[in-house]
Amino acid sequence: MSSSAIQVAKTATYLPDLVEVQRASFKWFLDLGLIEELESFSPITDYTGKLELHFIGSEYRLKRPRHDVEEAKRRDATFASQMYVTCRLVNKETGEIKEQEVFIGELPLMTERGTFIINGAERVIVNQIVRSPGVYFKDEMDKNGRRTYNASVIPNRGAWLKFETDKNSLLHVRVDKTRKINAHVLMRAMGLSDNDVLDKLRHPEFYKKSIDAANDEGISSEDQALLELYKKLRPGEPPSVSGGQQLLQTRFFDPKRYDLGRVGRYKINKKLRLTIPDTVRTLTHEDVLSTLDYLINLELDVGGASLDDIDHLGNRRVRSVGELLQNQVRVGLNRLERIIKERMTVGETDSLTPAQLVNPKPLVAAIKEFFGSSQLSQFMDQTNPLAELTHKRRISALGPGGLTRERAGFAVRDIHPSHYGRLCPIETPEGPNAGLINSLATHARVNEYGFIETPFWKVENGVVIKDGDPIYLSADREDEVRVAPGDVATESDGRIKADLIPVRYRQDFEKVPPEQVDYVALSPVQVISVAASLIPFLEHDDANRALMGSNMQRQAVPLLRPERALVGTGLETQVARDSGMVPISRVNGTVIFVDATAIVVQDEDGQEHTHYLQKYQRSNQDTCLNHRPIVRCGDQVIVGQVMADGSACEGGEIALGQNVLIAYMPWEGYNFEDALLVSERLVTDDLYTSVHIEKYEIEARQTKLGPEEITREIPNVAEESLGNLDEMGIIRVGAFVESGDILVGKVTPKGESDQPPEEKLLRAIFGEKARDVRDNSLRVPGTERGRVVDVRIYTREQGDELPPGANMVVRVYVAQRRKIQVGDKMAGRHGNKGIISRILPREDMPYLPDGTPVDICLNPLGVPSRMNVGQVFELLMGWAASNLDSRVRIVPFDEMHGAEMSQETCEAFLKEAAKQPGKAWVYNPDDPGKLVLRDGRTGQPFDQPVAVGYSHFLKLVHLVDDKIHARSTGPYSLVTQQPLGGKAQQGGQRLGEMEVWALEAYGAAYTLQELLTVKSDDMQGRNEALNAIVKGKPIPRPGTPESFKVLMRELQSLGLDIAVYTDEGKEVDLMQDVNPRRSTPSRPTYESLGVADYDED
């Protein structure tokens, strides 16, 4: 297929750098965030005030990391840099100053791709969206149906302050959800006189009631107010004025305990129209009085006061890596401060140095904990480039300081008008996290305060002005202007065509003439996320199916021979480039050397730059990372040019699947309920073959009986099983291994008790020690097979860090090619997913008039009810494109070029294709888009014409090889003694309550008895049954299930006298000791029954 791409609709602009949100935030942390934290703790003074330790934060430095990124991955190390900071110790008494550079810990560094390498694994820190600090006004209904108002002042850290009104028009205040206090008590405690307060209020008469109430309670002075405050906040402790003073001071006016943050100060100033400088991060009297004033205006419904919508994006902000890390550093420094103070007090004042005071451990621990186990530090999804990119742009409302799944209501999850151009309304998970985890829209960016902004073009007098950079607006700012959507039609000079334009204004829609429009959106794509923007004809799909389509593209497995989509949206190149999976030229220059492992570029100054390529590396999801060069020697390259294809890329574009010939028709019921019927061509031509790399690991440990040994000499193993092992007993690279083959030979010393009696006898007679080791080798597990692509040996001698107790670690990487097979899951880009139900020989598949057999038959009933008609447009456009030998790029929302544009474009392309020589049959005007197909088995035409065309289909990561599983015997749960569940635990299939009902309905008594006893938790019965099966004897009668015994014990523990009796009324002792080696069977088994007993039964 030629690579000439026809661009049908123009993209408005190139997208901005898609990983910017991660990189910019980490850069801010290194430039400002870390310094800010270090300096906020300086100086640290000891309890006597003699010594002071100053951190000179602006002079911190980072050492070059010990390992580079690749080395860190290989050694399971962390890609981190050591932090040093200059400390100054001042002795106040002698005036002596000691200055020293001190090591304060290791800081993991971000790689170029926006990820972190922690213990050899690539991780991503997900952005968190939280409620912005500031002041919020809400209304609530009380029990009597009267509306009351309240105001909450929410800091970045510290105590919440909540003012509320009640039915008697009194003002109350709560600190951190404690008991109500009269608001005027707080005012007096803060040292404000009645007149100070009344002068600041626009409606003082409303407040006078609260003053009277305070006087009635006998609180007329500052001291009384402080005592009252202390009583309410610290009930049960003896109150004192100084205690109250201290409490108030630390709760709200101490920068260490109370911090509004830059954002909180900015929001409060904006809401209450104050002009307090943003260096003042604590509460001020002015804040409190203005809040009261605003609340009273709300209560009286005057002065333009308005309530806040907490789900509005102007009131939610994004915390990215930098800020999350800064919070964690603060936790570490808090611990460090305590240690330093203790050491100052304990140590000898004269001989102390800064290095003795500063212990790096608490800071290291805090940072390690954040990267290793925080909810927001996630193992990177590396299935394909799109998955990686989307993961870095994810925005989660969960995590520390955020919401929890259980508490999040419907309003938080819902789409809000302020999401436009900021958060994608489509891409979110299905299930309990729906709406809590979102994706950043394509053009969105995060501003310095953490609010999401989106770009617009300015409109003046009905003309769109597109020179210069677009203007970014935050959600608050956007509400105040009239914004037209991105698909308004304009003349060539930028003048808006229509007489009335639909605009959004204050979260409502209205129609206005072009002169009143203030801004117009940049592009129709700016509303959606990167994954959704890769779906062609997105506007014809129902939103639920588009959601599945964008989620399933992230699960596409990189194929052996990827192929670009025939019908795309034009954003594929940038997605591939920004994902970080493809190598990009760092300089302008000429390629002077290319091979499979490296590309060398010579720049204009004659310097050589080597770009190394990855070969068959294992990704986090066991898919294969591999680079294939696409430049040749002598090619000119420019900065940012893609030089090699990564996995799931072709020609520098993302290529997640294959373009296959699809027919929408039923075939013998094999595509009932979303099943797929596919042709054998997909298997034989390796269209959907993917490479998967598994990692197997074994450690040789030090045991009590001596060290384990990695060796070729394994007891009781035939020589042919060792054919592929080297002299150390490790498999050679390139060997093909199947289930049960030895990868690494290992023997473990055996203790006395492990030895069978005949061994002991031999040793007693001959006195010589038989080689007492047992085979503990690493073998290929159950269903796996493949080729060994890499072996890595780690020992302490080489300087590798090993887990405690291990002498040697060996890792073997096995690659397998997986062809497509029955049970694999496939999907299109429009949420049309299905499982392969049958693979037909190509001669039996329906075929086209020119004899081409179809690749996949889809059920036509999958389209109407699901309303994802985009797949039909893609099908027809792909059919036209393949017959024109070209590729088509269509930007979503093309209706801006005219009504019914998609349909007209498809039809025009089909007519064009039919004009090609010998292609007249491609388009039938009586049945546009359909062809008469013939049955491959009989050669007879089908009754109805069928819609046929090329569609981009993906193979998803849910492969049947990884799911299929069977259990004969295996591990049991410790508590219930029932088999475990799941493939990883070698578990069984659960027969739950409803399955038991189904069997009861059929009266399958013996099946039921087995299910509830020997196949489950009758411990003795199952051992006897196994024994009987192995020896070929009849299976004995089942006994009592363990869970029944538990039930009996539970009922007895309630004080009920419950027991089990035989027919004769004899009590059965359920708790008798079960000893399988007893000579007399505990109950009749088939062996112990006489012939006479059989007859009676």
Swiss-Prot record:
Region (Disordered): 1072-1097
Gene Ontology molecular function, alphabetical: DNA binding; DNA-directed RNA polymerase activity; ribonucleoside binding
Database matches in InterPro entries: DNA-dir_RNA_pol_bsu_ext_1_sf (IPR042107), DNA-dir_RNA_pol_bsu_external_1 (IPR019462), DNA-dir_RNA_pol_su2 (IPR015712), DNA-dir_RNAP_su2_dom (IPR007120), DNA-dir_RNAP_su2_hyb_sf (IPR037033), RNA_pol_bsu_bac (IPR010243), RNA_pol_bsu_CS (IPR007121), RNA_pol_bsu_protrusion (IPR007644)
Gene Ontology BP annotations: DNA-templated transcription
Signal peptide (from-to): none
Cellular component annotations (GO), alphabetically ordered: DNA-directed RNA polymerase complex
Family matches, as Pfam families: RNA_pol_Rpb2_1, RNA_pol_Rpb2_2, RNA_pol_Rpb2_3, RNA_pol_Rpb2_45, RNA_pol_Rpb2_6, RNA_pol_Rpb2_7
Function statement: DNA-dependent RNA polymerase catalyzes the transcription of DNA into RNA using the four ribonucleoside triphosphates as substrates.
Record's protein name: DNA-directed RNA polymerase subunit beta
Organism encoding this protein: Parasynechococcus marenigrum (strain WH8102)
